[in-house]
Amino acid sequence: NDRWSQKEFTMPIRKAIPSDIPVLNHLLEQVLLVHHKVRPDIFKESGRKFNDEQLKTLMSQENTPIFVFENEEGKILGHLFCIIKEPQSLAQTPIKTLFIEDLCVDENARSQKIGEQLCHFAEEFAQKIGCYNLTLDVWNDNVAALRFYEHLDLKPQQTIMEKILKK
Protein backbone atom coordinates (compact mmCIF):
# COMPACT_ATOMS: atom_id res chain seq x y z
CA ASN A 1 0.00 0.00 0.00
CA ASP A 2 1.93 2.98 -1.29
CA ARG A 3 -0.22 5.93 -0.25
CA TRP A 4 2.15 8.66 -1.39
CA SER A 5 2.18 7.56 -5.02
CA GLN A 6 -1.58 7.21 -5.36
CA LYS A 7 -2.24 10.93 -5.68
CA GLU A 8 -0.66 13.61 -7.75
CA PHE A 9 -0.59 16.87 -5.85
CA THR A 10 -0.12 20.24 -7.43
CA MET A 11 2.22 21.28 -4.70
CA PRO A 12 3.31 24.83 -3.95
CA ILE A 13 6.73 23.52 -2.90
CA ARG A 14 9.96 25.12 -4.05
CA LYS A 15 13.63 25.25 -3.12
CA ALA A 16 14.38 27.64 -0.29
CA ILE A 17 16.25 30.86 -1.06
CA PRO A 18 18.20 33.17 1.28
CA SER A 19 15.25 35.57 1.67
CA ASP A 20 13.33 32.66 3.30
CA ILE A 21 15.79 32.49 6.21
CA PRO A 22 13.72 34.54 8.74
CA VAL A 23 10.72 32.24 8.21
CA LEU A 24 12.92 29.13 8.34
CA ASN A 25 14.31 30.36 11.67
CA HIS A 26 10.77 30.84 13.00
CA LEU A 27 9.79 27.29 11.94
CA LEU A 28 13.01 25.83 13.38
CA GLU A 29 12.15 27.51 16.72
CA GLN A 30 8.78 25.74 16.64
CA VAL A 31 10.52 22.38 16.05
CA LEU A 32 12.91 23.07 18.92
CA LEU A 33 10.01 23.81 21.28
CA VAL A 34 8.30 20.51 20.34
CA HIS A 35 11.56 18.66 21.00
CA HIS A 36 12.08 20.58 24.27
CA LYS A 37 8.62 19.53 25.48
CA VAL A 38 9.42 15.89 24.67
CA ARG A 39 13.03 15.88 25.98
CA PRO A 40 13.82 18.98 28.09
CA ASP A 41 16.94 17.19 29.33
CA ILE A 42 18.39 17.29 25.79
CA PHE A 43 16.77 20.26 24.03
CA LYS A 44 16.84 23.91 25.12
CA GLU A 45 13.63 25.91 25.23
CA SER A 46 14.97 28.39 22.71
CA GLY A 47 17.94 28.72 20.44
CA ARG A 48 18.99 28.08 16.88
CA LYS A 49 19.85 24.84 15.17
CA PHE A 50 21.60 26.75 12.36
CA ASN A 51 22.84 30.32 12.03
CA ASP A 52 22.04 32.31 8.86
CA GLU A 53 25.39 31.49 7.23
CA GLN A 54 24.89 27.77 7.87
CA LEU A 55 21.42 27.98 6.31
CA LYS A 56 22.84 29.73 3.23
CA THR A 57 25.51 27.01 2.96
CA LEU A 58 22.91 24.24 3.23
CA MET A 59 20.85 25.94 0.50
CA SER A 60 23.86 26.16 -1.80
CA GLN A 61 24.99 22.54 -1.45
CA GLU A 62 23.72 19.86 -3.81
CA ASN A 63 23.43 17.22 -1.05
CA THR A 64 21.50 19.34 1.49
CA PRO A 65 18.44 20.75 -0.29
CA ILE A 66 15.89 22.74 1.68
CA PHE A 67 12.34 23.08 0.36
CA VAL A 68 9.48 25.30 1.51
CA PHE A 69 5.72 25.01 1.20
CA GLU A 70 4.36 28.38 0.07
CA ASN A 71 0.62 29.11 -0.08
CA GLU A 72 -1.18 31.15 -2.74
CA GLU A 73 -0.53 34.37 -0.79
CA GLY A 74 3.23 33.71 -0.80
CA LYS A 75 3.34 32.79 2.90
CA ILE A 76 5.68 29.94 3.85
CA LEU A 77 3.77 27.42 5.94
CA GLY A 78 6.28 24.60 6.15
CA HIS A 79 9.78 23.41 5.40
CA LEU A 80 11.64 20.24 4.50
CA PHE A 81 15.38 19.96 5.18
CA CYS A 82 16.96 17.00 3.37
CA ILE A 83 20.34 15.30 3.27
CA ILE A 84 21.26 13.03 0.38
CA LYS A 85 23.35 10.23 1.90
CA GLU A 86 25.48 7.55 0.30
CA PRO A 87 27.22 5.05 2.61
CA GLN A 88 31.00 5.22 2.84
CA SER A 89 31.35 1.83 4.53
CA LEU A 90 32.66 -1.09 2.49
CA ALA A 91 30.28 -3.31 4.47
CA GLN A 92 27.18 -1.51 3.17
CA THR A 93 25.46 -1.78 -0.18
CA PRO A 94 26.07 1.44 -2.14
CA ILE A 95 22.53 2.82 -1.94
CA LYS A 96 21.46 6.45 -2.01
CA THR A 97 19.14 7.59 0.80
CA LEU A 98 17.11 10.78 1.18
CA PHE A 99 17.23 11.61 4.88
CA ILE A 100 14.65 14.10 6.15
CA GLU A 101 16.68 16.18 8.59
CA ASP A 102 13.78 18.42 9.56
CA LEU A 103 10.12 18.73 8.60
CA CYS A 104 7.89 21.41 10.07
CA VAL A 105 4.45 22.82 9.39
CA ASP A 106 3.73 26.18 11.02
CA GLU A 107 1.72 25.67 14.22
CA ASN A 108 -1.03 27.94 12.81
CA ALA A 109 -1.36 25.89 9.61
CA ARG A 110 -1.50 22.32 10.94
CA SER A 111 -4.23 19.79 10.02
CA GLN A 112 -4.33 21.04 6.41
CA LYS A 113 -2.38 18.11 4.89
CA ILE A 114 0.71 20.30 4.38
CA GLY A 115 2.93 17.79 6.18
CA GLU A 116 1.59 15.01 3.97
CA GLN A 117 2.30 17.08 0.87
CA LEU A 118 5.87 17.76 2.05
CA CYS A 119 6.39 14.02 2.66
CA HIS A 120 4.89 13.15 -0.71
CA PHE A 121 7.18 15.70 -2.32
CA ALA A 122 10.18 14.20 -0.48
CA GLU A 123 9.32 10.75 -1.79
CA GLU A 124 8.89 11.98 -5.37
CA PHE A 125 12.15 13.94 -5.14
CA ALA A 126 13.97 10.89 -3.73
CA GLN A 127 12.69 8.69 -6.55
CA LYS A 128 13.66 11.30 -9.14
CA ILE A 129 17.26 11.43 -7.91
CA GLY A 130 17.55 7.64 -7.71
CA CYS A 131 17.27 7.02 -3.98
CA TYR A 132 16.68 3.52 -2.63
CA ASN A 133 14.86 4.77 0.47
CA LEU A 134 13.63 7.71 2.51
CA THR A 135 14.57 7.91 6.19
CA LEU A 136 14.15 10.25 9.15
CA ASP A 137 14.59 10.31 12.92
CA VAL A 138 11.67 10.72 15.28
CA TRP A 139 11.73 10.83 19.07
CA ASN A 140 9.81 7.95 20.68
CA ASP A 141 7.98 10.32 23.04
CA ASN A 142 6.78 12.48 20.14
CA VAL A 143 3.65 10.36 19.72
CA ALA A 144 1.94 12.72 17.26
CA ALA A 145 4.94 12.61 14.91
CA LEU A 146 5.23 8.82 15.23
CA ARG A 147 1.55 8.41 14.29
CA PHE A 148 1.90 10.87 11.42
CA TYR A 149 4.83 9.00 9.86
CA GLU A 150 3.23 5.58 10.47
CA HIS A 151 0.11 6.87 8.69
CA LEU A 152 2.36 7.62 5.71
CA ASP A 153 3.67 4.02 5.73
CA LEU A 154 7.09 4.71 7.22
CA LYS A 155 8.36 1.80 9.31
CA PRO A 156 11.00 1.68 12.07
CA GLN A 157 14.41 0.88 10.59
CA GLN A 158 16.59 0.85 13.70
CA THR A 159 16.33 1.83 17.35
CA ILE A 160 18.80 3.92 19.31
CA MET A 161 18.94 2.70 22.92
CA GLU A 162 19.69 5.04 25.81
CA LYS A 163 20.55 4.85 29.49
CA ILE A 164 20.76 8.22 31.26
CA LEU A 165 23.82 8.25 33.51
CA LYS A 166 23.60 11.72 35.09
CA LYS A 167 20.50 12.66 36.99
Each predicted region: which residue ranges?
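Conserved beta-strand-loop-alpha-helix junction that forms the acyl-donor binding cleft
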Residues: T135-A145, E162-K166
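Conserved acetyl-CoA-binding loop-helix of GNAT-fold acetyltransferases
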Residues: D102-V105, S111-E124, H151
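A short helix-loop-beta-strand connector motif used in the catalytic cores of GNAT acetyltransferases and
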Residues: E53-V68, F99
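Conserved active-site alpha-helix within GNAT-family acetyltransferase domains
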Residues: E116, H120, K128, N140-Q158
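Conserved GNAT acetyl-CoA-binding A-motif
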Residues: A126-D137
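A short beta-loop-alpha structural element at the N-terminal edge
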Residues: P12-H26, H35
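Conserved GNAT-fold acetyl-CoA-binding loop/helix
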Residues: L32-L55
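Conserved beta-strand in the GNAT
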Residues: V68, K75-I84, C104
